[in-house]
Structures are given as C-alpha cells and as structure tokens.
Amino acid sequence: MSCDPPVDDADVPRFWRELGLPGLVDVHVHFLPAPVQAKVWAYFEAAETHYGAAWPVHYPLPEDERLAVLSRLGVRAFPTLPYPHKPGMAAWLNDWSHDFAAAHPQVLSSATFFPEPEAPHYVAEALDRGVRVFKVHVQVGAFDPRDPLLDPVWARLAETGTPVVIHCGSGPLRGEHTGPAPMTGLLERHPRLQLVIAHLGMPEYREFLDLAERYERVHLDTTMFATDFTERLMPFDPGDRPRLGALRDRVLLGSDFPSIPYPYAEQLAALARLDLGDDWLRAVLWHNGARLFGVAA
C-alpha cells in the first residue's frame, strides 16, 4: 500500500487524498428522528445485556454536530437508512428521511418498508419522490424477507434497480429470519435485486460471499468489518481475503456512523490492513459507491 492508514479522525482526509480520491462515499450511515435515535442509543447503553459486550457509542452528538463530523472526515455522500421494528412506522420514517435529504444535499434520500398491506403504496411513493436507497433490517424487524406481502415491493425494486441496504446476517444478534437461507430464497425469486449486504453478512461472511459471486447485483458493505471490535466477536477467515479482493467492484464502504464503539478512522484502518491494494481501497472508498448512487467527483 502506498500510504499509511489514518491514525485518527483528523488524519482521515490525508488518507483519502494520498489515494487520489475526492473524498468518501459511505453507504451505511444512520440519521433518524430524534426520539428514534434516542431509543437506539439507549439500547446500545445496555449492550452488555444484549450482546455480552460493551458498546460505547463514539458519536452521541446533536444532529448538526454529526453532520459536521462527516464533513470534516470528507464523507461526500451518505444515506439516512431508517428502519421500522413494527407495522405503521415505515411511511412516517420515509417522510422524515425525505425531508432530511431535501435539506442536506450530501444526503442520499433513503426509505424503508415493512411487510404490511400498505408497503407497495408507500414504496411507490418514495420512488416517485426520487428515493436513492432503501434500508431493511431483518433482525430488528423480525420478519422473513420472503413474506408474500413484500413480493410486489421486491418485484418493483428489481425492476427499478434501486439499491437496498439489508441487514440480514446473524450478527451481532441472531434472529428467526437472519442468515443466508432467506436471502438465497429471495434472490431465487428476484435475481435482479440490487442488494447491499450490510456488515458483509457477519458472521456468515463466507455464505454471503457465495451469494455475491452468484448474483451480479449483490454488493457487500464493510460496516464494522475487520475492526478489532468485530474481530474479537465475529472473526473473518483470512483465507477468504482473495475472494473479497476479486469482488472489488461490489464492495462498498459502510461504517454505521454514528453508533460505532470506536473512531471512524478505525474502520478505514481496518480495511487498509486487509492489504488488498490501493486500487481495491479506491474502489471501496469512493468509486463503487459513486457509481451505484451517481455521486459526482
């Protein structure tokens, strides 16, 4: 690698500049309505109960300060990625996210959905308003992505090619419908879906690499991947690094900002430590996300 990994957040711009990049595209960032964000952070405060490990949120800041942090880091484009945990939430989350993106040009307009009769209507409405990415969280939502109520939604998204960031792996918590089997079934029905597998599918990394190799529109995001925090809990087999290298054009930078238990720079340093080369880093940190979401340099 031609440049050293960043040592802290202040060093991040030096890192991407030395790679010859105009900044970063992060496909896994959360901005949520204040009451929802407060509940998320309260959950992480009790992480030892939920996960058996502490999860000290590194950026528990007011909204404007979080936006400023991303700007200083050089994150040029990012989504809000709302997700519901029960029926009746998705439509108002979508309205909030639409308004937030309209107020901040660096934000990729985001939306979500839940298996409920209204889903095809509000997904169509989001598409008509120019949504650029959807978010689905299988474990938090506690639903099967193959639910028949979602068939018309998936069919429409396969047709439009709109990316869907989907948390479907069994980490950090297993759910009834997490893991590769439900996603395999979904892709067998809708092979043209433009999916972004969050967290590289941890801990089922290998099985989700299989899916990315099998389906040309399946991508993987790096959220929390290869960091010291994650490696202690859900290690990645170094023997699979060549497969990750071969999928260079479909791996996307993700961070889970702001609710990460370490500085943002640690995610970038972890990716650099994989030693997959500068071209791989350039693709992951900028080019792939910029291409998928139409972000200009």
Language-model segments: which ranges?
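Active-site-adjacent beta->alpha loops and helix N-cap segments on the catalytic face
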Residues: M89-D95, E118-H121, F143-V153
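Histidine-centered divalent metal-coordination motifs
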Residues: H28-A34, H167, H199
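Catalytic pocket-lining loop regions of alpha/beta-barrel enzymes
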Residues: C3-D8, R132-V133, F143-L252
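Short, acidic/polar
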Residues: P60-L70, W92, P115-A126
